[in-house]
Regions:
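Short hydrophobic beta-strand element within catalytic cores of glycosyltransferases
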Residues: 132-136
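Short alpha-helical segment that forms part of, or immediately flanks, the ligand-binding pocket
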Residues: 101, 119, 124-128, 142-144
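Nucleotide-activated donor-binding/catalytic signature segment of Leloir-type glycosyltransferases, i.e.
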Residues: 77-101, 109
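A short, well-ordered alpha-helix in the C-terminal region of glycosyltransferases
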Residues: 174-188
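Aromatic "clamp/platform" in nucleotide-sugar-dependent glycosyltransferases that forms part
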Residues: 115
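Donor nucleotide-sugar binding/catalytic pocket of nucleotide-sugar-dependent glycosyltransferases
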Residues: 1-26
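Conserved donor-binding/catalytic core segment of Leloir-type glycosyltransferases
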Residues: 34-51, 57-62
Length: 188
């Protein structure tokens, strides 16, 4: 059951927002435990070049070649492009709402690589879950959500992507603080 209520459209500092209602039985560590994963970022949406996924794969693979860490990229959504076959990229396809929220809640961050988004419900859901976001800084709307909320970061090139990912994966204190700010932002 979709928990989005469009009658609750709100104004967040000039940017439209939506009332987000999350299930009460989210288990953020369930996916990690079942898969034996410690750190991961998550992408939720159509896996498509038009959504920035080709660049996401290129940046993530380069990052993994340069860094010695165990971070994984978990994908949820319809696949319309080839996904690199790697142990550190996990595609779940379409998932139940329960699994979606459990996976999102356990992530170090949600990644949104698209340059062309308006109001992203999945970004707001992530913030409501206390999970920071990393967005493509060429998408002005998502970038401004990060700036105003202080619950996310943005990148415009590989070096910024790598730095933001390092921060989210390696700095639990920063993740926790940004997570709290995200919840406050969505609750406004």
């Amino acid at each position: 059951e979709n928990k989005f209520h469009n009658e609750n459209i709100i104004n967040n500092g000039g940017f439209g927002g939506a009332g987000i209602e999350l299930p009460s039985d989210i288990e953020p560590y369930k996916f990690k435990k079942e898969r034996g994963i410690d750190n991961y970022i998550v992408y939720v949406g159509r896996i498509d070049t038009h959504k920035g996924c080709q660049q996401l794969f290129e940046y993530f693979i380069k990052y993994k070649q340069e860094k010695n860490n165990d971070v994984k990229l978990v994908l949820m959504g319809k696949t319309v492009m080839e996904i690199p076959e790697r142990d550190d990229i996990i595609s779940l396809g379409f998932v139940s709402e329960e699994l979606k929220y459990n996976v999102m809640a356990g992530a170090d961050a949600l990644i949104m690589p698209s340059e062309f988004e308006s109001l992203s419900i999945v970004v707001l859901e992530s913030l409501a879950l206390g999970v920071p976001v990393i967005v493509n800084g060429l998408c002005e709307v998502l970038k401004q959500h990060c700036v105003i909320s202080r619950a996310g970061t943005y990148y415009t090139n590989y070096d910024e992507f790598a730095n933001q990912l390092d921060d989210m994966v390696c700095d639990g204190g920063l993740r926790e603080e940004m997570g709290k700010l995200g919840v406050q932002y969505v609750d406004r």
